[in-house]
């Protein structure tokens, strides 16, 4: 039996079958959600965290943001019962013997700090392996609170929470996806499960929107970095890993933490196209092939264009790359642009691309205007 992949508009409800042995993902329900083209703003690598939950009796809240898919061991039990790879709360009870059931308002919650504040385009509430102990429904709210607020500050009465996903029934052992159409910048989410139960993973897809005051204070920074508002627009091949890995923070940690393409059997080449945070002047380039040893790109070139209708201008000609090496290049003069493209020859991979520079006056003004429009 194989995992089920219905249309992107599918909504999963109801129990999954009890685990019957073999591959636990064989009857997992999922869909190809269009919003997953965006970056995961709740990525631990970006600095996201689950900072509080009202209950985590059976399984800890931090599991929600673990990078890999949830694991299941049918024989793994502890002193409190079955150990699950997710966030699981105790069973709610009513106030008395006459009313033993939870009320319609009863729910459990977890507070999530986004690693990169931004506009949320979609949320996946994954109940993998929670077959009969998943929540009846979930809801998701968002707030924009500057600085580094504590859980108590986020729960204060003066914090305005906006509904991103209304209370909606979900299914067990399924990727429950929700498109979000709220055009606002958020820093924190509150995930609610009604009335109780377990969630394996949470993914929050969207566009990072950085604070322009912070970028102005930095002066020179990586203008294509995900955390600074850069994003991948398209790529020629995503066979082994996502192109967004190339603009993640820090150095690659292992081979699959970069971007690797399938082997080419023609005379073409592979590429990634990026949108910069805003119009910027680029002064230096880094291309890192860390952990890519027998599968590193052989050569790379970098081009930029200024505006959607601009022409591509090569700023780094086709240059030989070494495996498992960080390559640094300085430009003879700053080059202004809004988009960038890296071409690798003939195939293979790179782990990171860095474009160091600063916002132009026009770019800073546009970023500030968008930040303010989004409620930043």
Swiss-Prot record:
Task: Report the pathway entry.
Answer: Nitrogen metabolism; (S)-allantoin degradation; (S)-ureidoglycolate from allantoate (aminidohydrolase route): step 1/1
Which Enzyme Commission number(s) are listed?
Answer: 3.5.3.4
SUPFAM superfamilies membership: Galactose-binding domain-like
Q: Which reaction does it catalyse?
A: allantoate + H2O = (S)-ureidoglycolate + urea
The record ties this protein, via Pfam families, to:
Allantoicase
A single Gene Ontology MF term assigned here is: allantoicase activity
InterPro entries under this entry? Answer: Allantoicase, Allantoicase_dom, Galactose-bd-like_sf
Q: What are the recorded Gene Ontology BP terms?
A: allantoin catabolic process; purine nucleobase metabolic process
Please provide the record's keywords in A-Z order. Hydrolase, Purine metabolism
Stretch forming the signal peptide: none
Q: Which NCBIfam families has this protein been placed in? A: allantoicase (TIGR02961)
Stated family: Belongs to the allantoicase family.
Q: What is this protein called?
A: Probable allantoicase
The species this protein belongs to is: Streptomyces avermitilis (strain ATCC 31267 / DSM 46492 / JCM 5070 / NBRC 14893 / NCIMB 12804 / NRRL 8165 / MA-4680)
């Amino acid at each position: 039996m194989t995992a089920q992949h219905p249309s992107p508009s599918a909504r999963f409800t109801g129990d999954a079958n009890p685990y019957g042995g073999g591959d636990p993902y064989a009857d997992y329900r999922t869909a190809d959600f269009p919003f997953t083209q965006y970056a995961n703003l709740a990525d631990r690598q970006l600095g996201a965290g689950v900072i509080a939950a009202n209950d985590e009796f059976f399984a800890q809240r931090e599991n929600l943001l673990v990078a890999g898919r949830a694991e299941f061991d049918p024989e793994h039990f502890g002193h409190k019962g079955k150990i699950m790879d997710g966030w699981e709360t105790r069973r709610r009870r009513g106030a008395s013997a006459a009313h033993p059931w939870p009320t319609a308002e009863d729910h459990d919650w977890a507070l999530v700090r986004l690693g990169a504040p931004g506009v949320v385009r979609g949320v996946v509430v994954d109940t993998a392996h929670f077959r009969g102990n998943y929540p009846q429904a979930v809801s998701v709210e968002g707030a924009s609170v500057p600085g580094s607020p504590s859980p108590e500050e986020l729960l204060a009465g003066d914090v305005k929470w906006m509904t991103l996903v209304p209370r909606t029934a979900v299914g067990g052992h399924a990727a429950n996806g929700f498109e979000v159409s709220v055009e606002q910048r958020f820093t924190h989410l509150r995930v609610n499960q009604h009335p109780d139960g377990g969630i394996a993973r949470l993914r929050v897809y969207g566009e990072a929107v950085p604070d322009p005051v912070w970028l102005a204070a930095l002066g020179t920074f990586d203008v294509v970095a995900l955390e600074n508002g850069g994003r991948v627009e398209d790529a020629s091949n995503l066979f082994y890993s996502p192109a967004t890995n190339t603009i993640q923070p820090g150095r690659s940690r292992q081979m699959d933490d970069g971007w690797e393409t399938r082997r080419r059997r023609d005379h073409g080449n592979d590429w990634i196209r990026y949108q910069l945070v805003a119009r910027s002047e680029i002064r230096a380039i880094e291309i890192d092939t860390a952990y890519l040893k027998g599968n590193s790109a052989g050569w790379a070139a970098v081009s930029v264009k200024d505006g959607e209708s601009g022409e591509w201008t090569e700023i780094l000609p086709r240059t030989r790359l070494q495996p498992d090496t960080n390559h640094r290049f300085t430009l003879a003069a700053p080059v202004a642009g809004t988009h960038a493209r890296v071409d690798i020859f003939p195939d293979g991979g790179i782990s990171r691309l860095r474009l160091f520079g600063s916002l132009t006056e026009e770019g800073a003004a546009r970023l500030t205007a968008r930040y303010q429009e989004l409620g930043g």
